C-alpha cells in the first residue's frame, strides 16, 4: 500500500459524476467510510473483471469489517457505460459495489487527481475499442481525501491485510 500524507491527500478540483442509479455523485459522498476505487470499464476483456473479482474476494476476507468500506468502479468509458449497464455489470461481483460514470472531462479531472490515469476514447467508430487505463486501486479515506493506492498486480491477501489495519 502506497500511503500519502499532507497536501498530497487533497482532492483539489471538485468533480461531478453520476452513480449507477442515475443520481449525481459529488466528492463529499465519499465521506463516512473507506473507499476503494478502480478506474475501468464494463467492456474490458481482462484486467477489469479480474480486479473486480479480487475486490469481491477482499471484501469477503474482511467479513464483518467490510461494512466500513465501499468499492467503486469508476468508468473510463462513459460512451458505453451508462448507469444501468454499470449496475448490471457490478451485480456479477457484489451487489453492494457501486458504479460511477459521467462526462469524460469530469472523470478525467478526478482520475488525474488520484493518480489513476487513462487515455480517453471519444466517439469511436470502432465498436470493440478498448481504453488504456491504470490498474491501480485508489484509496479514499472517510474524510473524502485521497489516501493512497495499491499498484497492480494485486495480491488479494496483502490488500486484505492492509485494509484490515485501516478499517480497525
Q: Whereabouts are the PLM-identified features?
A:
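Short loop/turn microsegments at loop-to-beta-strand junctions
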Residues: 12-13, 35, 134-136
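Hydrophobic beta-strand positions
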Residues: 16-17, 139
